[in-house]
C-alpha cells in the first residue's frame, strides 16, 4: 500500500475527522467564551467591586531601564483567564451531561439470553433421562 493511500485512509477515518471538527469548533468556542468573559462578565463585576478593570491588575517586578522594558506580572489577566476556564469547563460539563442523558435513553433493553447450545440441550436430555430412570427404580 502506498504511503499516500495509507495516509488518506487514516485521515478519512471517522474518529480523525470528528476530532478535527471538534478542535475547530473548540477554537471558535474559546474565542466566544473569551469575549463573553472580557466584554460581558468582567466589566459589571469590576463595576460592582468599585470600578476596577481586572486587566489593569499588575505588579511591576522591575522598572523599565532605557531600551529594556519593565518586567510586569499581569495577574488581572490571569484572573480573567481563570474565569474563561471556569466557563469553558462548565459548558463542557453540561454538554457531556446532556450527551450522557441522551445515551441513557438510547440504551437497549437487556438482550434475551442466548439459546442453549447443542451440548447444553444434549446434557439436559441426558439429565432428564437419568431422573426418569431413578424415579422408576
From Swiss-Prot:
It is found in: Cell inner membrane. Gene3D superfamilies: Large-conductance mechanosensitive channel, MscL, domain 1. It is a multi-pass membrane protein. The keyword Coiled coil does not apply. Keywords: Cell inner membrane, Cell membrane, Ion channel, Ion transport, Membrane, Transmembrane, Transmembrane helix, Transport. GO terms for molecular function: mechanosensitive monoatomic ion channel activity. SUPFAM superfamilies: Gated mechanosensitive channel. HAMAP family: MscL. Homopentamer. This is Large-conductance mechanosensitive channel. It comes from Klebsiella pneumoniae subsp. pneumoniae (strain ATCC 700721 / MGH 78578). The gene is mscL.
